């Protein structure tokens, strides 16, 4: 029986302990425990409290954030709806029905009181976005923008409610630039100008970097001119660098060189990077203003010094000013490696030989940077296209003798060196590189390496070495139906020597690799030339029969006038009169434009 009394006493104590009086109205009591919810109802008409019951009155100004499983949440559920505080549902009580408008204001103010700053911003922004959602659509890219930036951009477009500034636009443009949305970026900068909001260097840097990314040199050039002429903004180093890169990627070497020299000779770029002289608002300073600003800044520093020896101070300051002016005049030191690399690449694409060599040697003499493989490949390619094998050998020997640069030598550099030698048929030097340098540097020749050497052998009619290289390519599986040049060079090395059997072998390999019909016809014609020089006219007729069979199988394949000329010569030399007359009539009926050899045969056989 005592246990029963103790049980009831414990329950009563527990109920009393769970009660708390409100600090504002002592008669209003509410419970913390859910299972005591319906025990006492002090005031039925009382509105439901908006704040969760575990909050004390003294903590209303600060809403704590709790953490659970490394994720944060606040007192409001993530799915909460702000409109619920307006009591628009059907379950409004009698108290709210009496003064609905007052209740809305009261509850919304109370709700805002318990919100932190980010929740207040979301609460206001959602209403604005609902009104302005139909005015402008945000570009949907493959990597869509975060929701926060979408809201920022929508707010920028709703200019009636938001006072957009250059800083706000730059923030949105930065997000757009990271996502790569060029059309949205151009739309943003157009909106800035339409609202008379002046873009700054950051704005132009963001939009120009996207133009550089997508190789839109025309758009970048228009924006660059607008920045200088319309907005009166002097480009800084980064703007110059972006434009040089843009011109280099599109192969416009002349424009890349023009901007490179402007960057070199622009004193304000040097000033912004090292002298730290503030620009005027309209950015219209000239070289005299630069010197005046330097003197003015140094005179201000001079006034702050408490030194009685004015003459010595003046001399020291004058020397200091002179050194700064000399630094501005000596602008080559400010050019960074990336700009040298881009302008050298542009010179190579545009085949500007002298300019490319000039900038490459400047880069070497500066001593600040070590050229990368990219720069070496471009400069050797430029040398090979112009056939300057002497300078190519000079650069190559310097690379090879320098342990820091030797590691940069690769197959592409050796190929370009061989290409420069092939233009002048320097076979001895080319063979020395082929036999020694590849092995010494532990490099394996690729398809292009064999092709360059085959071209050299074809020029000097060295069919034996050419055929040997061709067999090596076949063994190393470097031959394919995508590249016909090794086949042509090998056959051409046999044309003047009359070694037709080598040419026939190369032709059979090409047929096994399933070359296209037109490519095969080219190889057939070169093989027929080799047969003509070796007086093997019967082989020419046999090859012609193969071409007839190919034409019957593929109606799109047509034998050209060069092939018919070789066959006509074979009929003439073999005294096959009727076949000669028939083929001659076919040539006349088709109204071909006769090559010199065919015209000669016609003139020699008028009475045939």
Swiss-Prot record:
Primary role: Binds to apicoplast RNA transcripts, preferentially to the motif UUAU, and protects RNA transcripts from degradation by ribonuclease.
Name of the protein in question: Pentatricopeptide repeat-containing protein 1, apicoplast
Family indicated by similarity: Belongs to the PPR family. P subfamily.
GO CC aspect terms: apicoplast
PANTHER family: OS03G0856100 PROTEIN (PTHR47447), OS12G0638900 PROTEIN (PTHR47447:SF17)
Subunit composition and interactions: Homodimer.
Keywords: Apicoplast, Plastid, Repeat, RNA-binding, Transit peptide
InterPro entries (alphabetical): Pentatricopeptide_rpt, TPR-like_helical_dom_sf
Pfam families reported in the protein's UniProt record: PPR
Gene: PPR1
Tagged with keyword RNA-binding: yes
Cellular localisation: Plastid, Apicoplast
Repeat positions for PPR: 165-199, 200-230, 236-270, 336-370, 372-402, 410-445, 446-480
Gene Ontology MF term list: mRNA binding; RNA binding
Primary site of residence: plastid
